[in-house]
Amino acid sequence: MTTTTSSIQDSSAAHTQNNTQPNDSTGTNTAAKNSAHVPLRVIIDNLSTNEGEVEIGVYTPENKFPDEKDKFKKYRFQPKSEQIDVLLEDLPYGELALAVYHDENNNGKIDKNFLGIPTEPYAFSNNFKPSFKAPSFDNCKFSYNEQNHVVRISLLNKRKPTK
């Protein structure tokens, strides 16, 4: 297992990728095998501020969704407006789920109240809105492939957007 950290710029956000890449049964790094894939385009809207960073956690069926410590990969972006539009590369085709939060105070974690409910804006793929418990992978999964490679997510905000 290798860990890599890289930083790139795109037109909509500063991007930092921190991930762990598993090897497949042949010992080949799966990210290298998947590098020819169409990137996953993620459009996130309803950001209330440009402060902090937006974190996207990517989960496969093998991960404990939405466990913050068991992500397949994570990406962090500096928002420049009320929406970010980013490309996530080196992901395997198949079923994935995304957990997103806006780390407004940039402390590297999602802040929660005494009940464990997030106090910073957050969202999940399929725009699943949890009620009294965390969502399951099945609630948020989608099929990522060459034909299906765009995901739109609206953050659940705790306050009104500022202009």
List each model region and its residues.
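Exposed aromatic-hydrophobic patches
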Residues: 83-90
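Surface-exposed loop/turn motifs at beta-strand-loop junctions within extracellular Ig-like
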Residues: 102-104, 157
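Primarily secretory-pathway and cell-envelope proteins
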Residues: 3-59, 112-163
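Acidic, glycine-anchored loop motifs typical of Ca2+
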Residues: 104-112
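Surface-exposed loops/turns
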Residues: 49, 80, 92-93
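A short tyrosine-centered beta-strand micro-motif
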Residues: 96-100
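Short amphipathic beta-strand segments in non-cytosolic proteins
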Residues: 57-75
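Short proline/glycine- and polar residue-rich coil/turn motifs
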Residues: 76-82, 144-145
